[in-house]
Amino acid sequence: MMFFGDRAVKYIVRKKSRTIILILIFIVVNILNITMLTISKNTNNMQSEIKQDTQSKIIIEKKNDYNISAKDIDFIKQNNEVININRISLQYAYPNNFNNFKGKIENNLREKMVTLYGYDDLSKDSRFAELEMKLVKGELINNKSKNAIIINQKLADSNSLDLGDKLVFRSTDKVIEGTICGIYESSIQDKQPETMTSFYRIENIIFVSQDISVILNNKEIYTKVVVYIADPEKIK
């Protein structure tokens, strides 16, 4: 053993430059291996974090005149991969104790209406999530909200409304009251043309909790449902 050790030492002394090159190659190879392992680990961690943060989702929308029913929702919930559902409804109603925001006036009954969007969670899958709209007062509608209403700042100003005030809506055969829990503004509301009629103006978009939508519609019907799932590959 000592013989081979002595020979190795003598070789290193005689071939210094070659030995240094071999050592450098060894170091570089090991650094590359460590780097690749680190990149692979970080990539896997990043993919896991992205999947957790974004929460894969499927969007189901009404087709033609067929709305999404409560029965459809129950069927969706039966899938074990479903972790959350955000139901979205749309209807139109007449203000009963306030006036809508006036745009270009047309001799049409719908020009006196407001647009109501019902949400389970307004912080997701909405114009608030896309940052087109932002809350300037109060709080957004969530799963626990009841009789909750969020209105536009200009609509509030034109009717001298504020947080806590009651609004009444009426449809063909229903009247429902709710409480203002939030006031919002839109980044594009001032870009609307002056010729835009009241019916289409952003100021007349009102967000409500789902219990208000159900009463106005006489039943649970939805125009869109966003289904959050744990693993898309396991959906059947």
Residue ranges and their predicted role:
Residues 18-20, 28-56:
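Alpha-helical transmembrane segments
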Residues 26, 90-91:
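Conserved beta-strand edge residues that scaffold enzyme active sites
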Residues 1-34:
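N-terminal Sec/SRP start-transfer signal
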Residues 49-58, 64-84, 91-236:
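Basic-flanked hydrophobic alpha-helices used for secretion and membrane insertion
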Residues 3-4, 38, 175, 224:
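Charged, alpha-helix-enriched surfaces in structured cytosolic catalytic cores
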